Structures are given as C-alpha cells and as structure tokens.
Curated annotation (Swiss-Prot):
The species this protein was found in: Pseudomonas putida (strain ATCC 47054 / DSM 6125 / CFBP 8728 / NCIMB 11950 / KT2440)
The organism's place on the tree of life at top rank: Bacteria
HAMAP family: ATP_synth_epsil_bac
Recorded family membership: Belongs to the ATPase epsilon chain family.
Name of the protein in its database record: ATP synthase epsilon chain
Places the protein is found: Cell inner membrane
Gene symbol of the encoding locus: atpC
Pfam families documented for this protein: ATP-synt_DE, ATP-synt_DE_N
Any Gene Ontology CC annotation: plasma membrane
C-alpha cells in the first residue's frame, strides 16, 4: 500500500475535497510542485490552473483553481483558493469563448482600458482550458 497524506481543498464557498492522497501536483508562482508524503513543510502562492490529486489507490482527480495558497505540513496538505471547480464540471466551449473574448478585449484598447483586468481574464480562461485538457489526458 502506497504512503498517503491528508489533503484538503477549500474555496471561499467551503470544503471541496478532503481525503487521503498519494500525490498533489499544482502550479506555483515559481514552477510546478509535486507534493508527496514526507515533503518538507512549505507555504507558496498558486497560479490559476489545474491541481491534480493522485488519490489512495491511484485514481486521479483534477480541479481548477483561480489561484490561491498551498500549505504543506508533515501530515497534511491544504489548498486555499477563491474559486475551485472540479475539472469535469468545466465547460470547454465556454472556456474557449472566454479566451477569445479576453483576447479581443486586449486588442480593442480604448481610453478606459484596464490592461491588468484584461490580462487576468485571459490568464484565467487559458488556465481553465489547460485544466480541461489535462483532465482529458489523464483519462
């Protein structure tokens, strides 16, 4: 039996996942992170994108987060995010439409243009698409 660590994924709306996992893979601000049982304690920012859990027994579950924080303690991994969705609940067509709308907004710069907000919408839509693609690849 593989070693496991307890993982909680929590959004502003409440707990989304709680259980034993063999591995957590997430996108930190400085690169990808793979957290396995026995990992050194750390706290880091997370970029928008997929979080992949390898659950006890080897099954994978993918979530989309809009960014947040990851905390690793000796017997626990905790992900705190504003928005969390199961990748299976994401609509690929809607994410592609949001990506196109964000790209168009960047091209139609006007006097009231908020580049930061447009870039954030573009990054979020691209991260949702990556999450859907990663979930499909894992099946």
């Amino acid at each position: 039996m593989a070693m496991t660590v307890h993982c909680d994924i929590v959004s502003a709306e409440g707990e989304i996942f709680s259980g034993l996992v063999e591995m957590v893979v997430a996108h930190g601000n400085l690169g990808d992170l793979g957290i396995a049982p026995g990992h050194a304690p750390l706290i880091t920012n997370l970029k928008p994108g997929p979080i992949t859990l390898t659950k006890q027994g080897g099954a994978h579950e993918v979530f989309y987060i809009s960014g947040g924080f990851l905390e690793v303690q000796p017997n626990m991994v905790k992900v705190l995010a504003d928005t969390v969705q199961r990748a299976a609940d994401l609509d690929e067509a809607q994410a592609q439409e949001a990506l196109k709308a964000a790209e168009n907004a960047l091209n139609l710069k006007g006097a009231d243009f908020d580049y930061g907000a447009a870039a954030a919408r573009l990054a979020e839509a691209a991260a949702q698409l990556r999450t859907v693609q990663q979930m499909r690849k894992g099946k």
